[in-house]
Amino acid sequence: MDINELIIGAQSADKHTREVAETQLLQWCDSDASQVFKALANVALQHEASLESRQFALLSLRKLITMYWSPGFESYRSTSNVEIDVKDFIREVLLKLCLNDNENTKIKNGASYCIVQISAVDFPDQWPQLLTVIYDAISHQHSLNAMSLLNEIYDDVVSEEMFFEGGIGLATMEIVFKVLNTETSTLIAKIAALKLLKACLLQMSSHNEYDEASRKSFVSQCLATSLQILGQLLTLNFGNVDVISQLKFKSIIYENLVFIKNDFSRKHFSSELQKQFKIMAIQDLENVTHINANVETTESEPLLETVHDCSIYIVEFLTSVCTLQFSVEEMNKIITSLTILCQLSSETREIWTSDFNTFVSKETGLAASYNVRDQANEFFTSLPNPQLSLIFKVVSNDIEHSTCNYSTLESLLYLLQCILLNDDEITGENIDQSLQILIKTLENILVSQEIPELILARAILTIPRVLDKFIDALPDIKPLTSAFLAKSLNLALKSDKELIKSATLIAFTYYCYFAELDSVLGPEVCSETQEKVIRIINQVSSDAEEDTNGALMEVLSQVISYNPKEPHSRKEILQAEFHLVFTISSEDPANVQVVVQSQECLEKLLDNINMDNYKNYIELCLPSFINVLDSNNANNYRYSPLLSLVLEFITVFLKKKPNDGFLPDEINQYLFEPLAKVLAFSTEDETLQLATEAFSYLIFNTDTRAMEPRLMDIMKVLERLLSLEVSDSAAMNVGPLVVAIFTRFSKEIQPLIGRILEAVVVRLIKTQNISTEQNLLSVLCFLTCNDPKQTVDFLSSFQIDNTDALTLVMRKWIEAFEVIRGEKRIKENIVALSNLFFLNDKRLQKVVVNGNLIPYEGDLIITRSMAKKMPDRYVQVPLYTKIIKLFVSELSFQSKQPNPEQLITSDIKQEVVNANKDDDNDDWEDVDDVLDYDKLKEYIDDDVDEEADDDSDDITGLMDVKESVVQLLVRFFKEVASKDVSGFHCIYETLSDSERKVLSEALL
């Protein structure tokens, strides 16, 4: 075959010609891969060939390498191997193309990609000279291509072991330092070397205190040399080089400095050295600010972008060292620079004023962009005192004297917002005076007739931050809060600017964060405030897009939180809230934030609702819900965001039943059939998940007498969901449905229970979906909590794939317990497994499950692809032993979680401890960290005797468990230890010292 003809054919515009050529190329490769690879490499080498053909040759090699080069690739075909001498030729050609500075960029990039691919399987064993060639190119020619290639190899190929023990790290660092120290190396070469330094630092950051001394010494020496060189580089003057390159050079230096500061031990970067770099960083920030101030917007967009990127890296470094002492002069320099750098560009001002949605995205933190303002925010929120208090005074004073310079004023107000978000308290002399002047200035901005809308919007956002920060310092905080909120809302209602309205709505959430508005405003004014906010939401909602819709729902959620506690006394507000929930969410049903917030709003609206009001809302909503379901019948309920949203809303309505009874009959009458149809015909995973959840609540919260005639239809739905024709993901919520059916119809379905449970168990054993697995286990928890023996009897009565169901279920259950999270789910599993442990059943004693993972002990270096094909091996342990170990592990985890009550009483307890320290008659008995079983039992028996009169309720079924997880576990261990249940004594002896210590600390 002629390779040139195949390449031309494979690039043809005609689909048939293209497919024929591609097929022929693969067939040729299957018969003689070496010949094809050699032919493609020769085409890539030919400068007289067209660029397209050369590029296609490299793209073909890139694809074929994974199929014919080595079994190390997952897509390896093993039909024809590339011969060793051809491999050598290919490697040589690729390096020649990649390292040739005069080569076309596309060709260099294509060759580089192939090199990285091959090195992933060949380096270092089959390609030991790879790095030598690259190092030579860097050392002798300062090759940018070589440094770029080495960077890519570091990302994809070089392992930690290669870096430290294989000598690659040392060789690379020597090359990097050589390029950076050589005066004749170009600025571009130094930038490339600095990028390579970052790759090396990433490798070194994996080291820890337990590493060998040689690694520690290597890292320490490299970091010391790096810091020395980086400091020298910052002092270099490249007057004859373009500004953009100089700024990129500074950026990468500060990027490396930040990484060293944040990702390595403090001992490597002394405070004295940090101070020296801090001085240089402030100077560089001033220089960058000067460049920024003198750049015409139309002159150079790339220059402005580079200025802002460099600013971000410098401020990020200052943030990393912000715990150092800053002088007043240094702080003034930083504020002056950031005030200029954080000024909005004319383009941003135009975008925000013409489309308020972009403003909302940025202010709510949902915009994808990251700019110098964001980094300034990080800096100011990280500053400790006294710098924080100092900077507050400076910025407040600057605001007072900049009211006529609007661009500067907006920037200063933004910086003030950042300062106020710092968690530290702002203190110091004359703070009260500065605060009063600031509040007066902000008040003047609100009443001014000539202030531009961006300044007004920024002031509206800043005011609640000021009030929040100084809530304890302002004697008139309540009237101030009420007055400023009223002024902001009235301004927004009068204004025709959507920017002002949206800023006010965001600010409203800030007020809600620190103030209980119903208490601050009083019931009447609070209701008026709700009405105003609802009116503003209505005014902007028609033009709201994406992030703004989510923000509006968040505001609405806050509004609903202040609804009167009396049963729905203000119907106008409630109806308006309902209307907004449905209109905003239906405008953007694919928006995750909107869906989540709208559900939250609806749940709040339905809290403690009585039957009459519930029926009123159902009359409003139900017809539209059913219309959406019916309209999707024709396409078998194919996924759509609106259908999912409606199913979410239906679920909320069915879950939040009236507080004075079951769901009204109308719900069952009109919703049962549409939901049953969705569950009968849909093949969409998400649709089936949502519909199953709604259906479960419909059954659970409807009067059994009203639902009983539909029992056969319910069983048909259940049969489909438990069948293996429905995917694991789609059947995710079938567990709660089974529990709902068992709860409501235990007598009616008695003859079918065995079949249902067998289907549940089969589904549980087969499923690979964690959520589905955990929900199906809820059924077993339900059964075990009610009758553990009958549950074991049932599971012992049949087999799945020639293994008894009891063994399979217990293995699955034990594996699932380790990943279960969520308090209610953890509790039900603890109660159920506890019941099985107390049962002391011989059938359970015979079950063995996976214990600890057995580590690989061979001599092979296990690659990722090899690891995937090697099954994990575990020590096999008795079920009861594993239950104890799981419970100890859970107890250890839960005991480390902070307890609010303990936090509140910690000071009191500390006083008691201090008092007891001096008490010579202290009759506390010292307890060792780890107790043997007899000693443990002795302490517990004493404890049980003391608490014998406590009349604690027995835990049965799946009732609400008031005890915490820790209390449940402690009670379990006290009982099994005191009574030696199911051979606990023997199990205890097998526990590790750390496990015994957990029990000792928890029980005593």
Swiss-Prot record:
Pfam families: HEAT_IPO9_c, IBN_N
Keyword field: Acetylation, Cytoplasm, mRNA transport, Nuclear pore complex, Nucleus, Protein transport, Translocation, Transport
Presence of the UniProt keyword Nucleus in the record: yes
S-S bridge residues: none
GO molecular function: nuclear import signal receptor activity; small GTPase binding
Annotated SUPFAM superfamilies: ARM repeat
Family that this chain belongs to: Belongs to the importin beta family.
Name of the molecule in the record: Importin subunit beta-5
Taxonomy of the source species: Eukaryota, Fungi, Dikarya, Ascomycota, Saccharomycotina
Name of the gene this protein is made from: KAP114
